């Protein structure tokens, strides 16, 4: 047993230090990034925010809506191959280029991924997603998928430390997904005692990945636009959002009416709700590691994504970053014990 003494930080522990800026307006800030990925050699241009691959977030409808903003969607893995074929026939090229095909690591998952990727050459992203990215099986699976799809962009995770980040990149991942337990409907840290404060995980994994020419996705922990900006400032190349994009008409969640008001069900992908729906219940050897909540129905996602991107643009103006790419270079975090003034409630 050993104890690491260094304090690790989450988004709530810091604020940006403002800096002198020549920018006159948020409209001058360019949030588009141009990436060339390490293994596939693929190029991609867009706003590096990703809707999470959760049942009630990463839907085909969400993908079509967010593509209008240049934003990506990691489509959840529970659509059938036939569903994907129909989607490919109804979506434009920009939408297809901005979706990630999510998969687990079983033999059935591998075959399904091959079937989906064969539908359209416009599918360029594969998201290999398991809860515990420290499994040797994941490394082997990444190698297998890389061999099968040498020209596709592969994301793999989730991990929170630089050593495993490096191992996944060396195995063939272009992007590593970073985050264990920070999500709004995740209870892994409570059920297992395992986790890592998300900002420190992003800083450390970003440093490791960038040293090898890889990239990272900061997955989870964002509750407001300021947190998204902090993730980018800490070195995330992409930021994945679940709860912030849940509850919208495009989210694909179950709508429930109570007392004349509409709510949408939102749950973690290791929750009892998810396992009841997809796995025939919680297996006898495991515990559910997610919550199920009812969110007030929020209407269209377009207003929400504009608000998030507007907040990030505003961050850039405060620190003098004309491009999102410059934000991490312009970032100085100050440690704090307060965030917003809650006299009139939380924003």
Swiss-Prot record:
It catalyses: IMP + NH4(+) + NADP(+) = GMP + NADPH + 2 H(+). It comes from the Bacteria. K(+) binds at residues 181, 183. Keywords: Metal-binding, NADP, Oxidoreductase, Potassium. Its EC number is 1.7.1.7. NADP(+) binds at residues 108-131, 216-239. GO terms for biological process: purine nucleotide metabolic process. The active site is at residue 186. Disulfide bonds: none annotated. PROSITE patterns: IMP_DH_GMP_RED (PS00487). GO terms for molecular function: GMP reductase activity; metal ion binding. GO terms for cellular component: cytosol; GMP reductase complex. InterPro entries: Aldolase_TIM, GMP_reductase, GMPR, IMP_DH/GMP_Rdtase_CS, IMP_DH_GMPRt. Belongs to the IMPDH/GMPR family. GuaC type 1 subfamily. Catalyzes the irreversible NADPH-dependent deamination of GMP to IMP. It functions in the conversion of nucleobase, nucleoside and nucleotide derivatives of G to A nucleotides, and in maintaining the intracellular balance of A and G nucleotides. Homotetramer. This is GMP reductase. The gene is guaC.
């Amino acid at each position: 047993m050993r104890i690491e003494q260094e304090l690790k930080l989450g988004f709530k522990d810091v604020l940006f230090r403002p800096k002198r800026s020549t920018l006159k307006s948020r409209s001058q800030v360019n949030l588009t990034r141009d990436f060339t990925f390490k293994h596939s050699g693929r190029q991609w241009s867009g706003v590096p925010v990703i809707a999470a691959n959760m049942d009630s977030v990463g839907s085909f409808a969400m993908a079509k809506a967010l593509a209008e903003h240049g934003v990506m969607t990691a489509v959840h893995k529970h659509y059938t191959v036939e569903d994907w074929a129909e989607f490919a026939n109804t979506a434009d090229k920009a939408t297809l280029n901005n979706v990630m095909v999510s998969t687990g690591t079983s033999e059935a998952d591998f075959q399904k991924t091959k079937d989906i990727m064969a539908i359209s050459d416009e599918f360029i992203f594969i998201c290999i997603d398991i809860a515990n990215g420290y499994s040797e099986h994941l490394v082997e699976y990444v190698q297998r998928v890389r061999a099968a799809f040498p020209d596709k962009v592969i994301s793999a995770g989730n991990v929170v430390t630089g050593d495993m980040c490096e191992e996944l990149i060396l195995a063939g991942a272009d992007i590593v997904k970073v985050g264990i337990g920070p999500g709004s409907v995740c209870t892994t840290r409570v059920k297992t005692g395992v986790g890592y404060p998300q900002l420190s995980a992003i800083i450390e994994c970003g440093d490791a990945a960038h040293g090898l020419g890889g990239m990272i996705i900061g997955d989870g922990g964002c509750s407001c636009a300021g947190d998204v900006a902090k993730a980018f400032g800490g070195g995330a190349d992409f930021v994945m959002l679940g709860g912030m994009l849940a509850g919208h008409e495009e989210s694909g969640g179950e709508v429930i009416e109570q007392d004349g008001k509409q709510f949408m069900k939102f749950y973690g992908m290791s929750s009892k709700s998810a396992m009841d729906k997809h796995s025939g219940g919680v297996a006898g050897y495991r515990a559910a590691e997610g919550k199920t909540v009812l969110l007030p129905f929020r209407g269209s996602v377009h207003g929400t994504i504009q608000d998030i991107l507007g907040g990030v643009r505003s961050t850039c103006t405060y620190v003098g970053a004309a491009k999102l790419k410059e934000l991490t270079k312009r970032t100085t975090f100050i440690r704090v014990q307060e965030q917003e003034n809650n006299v009139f409630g939380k924003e």
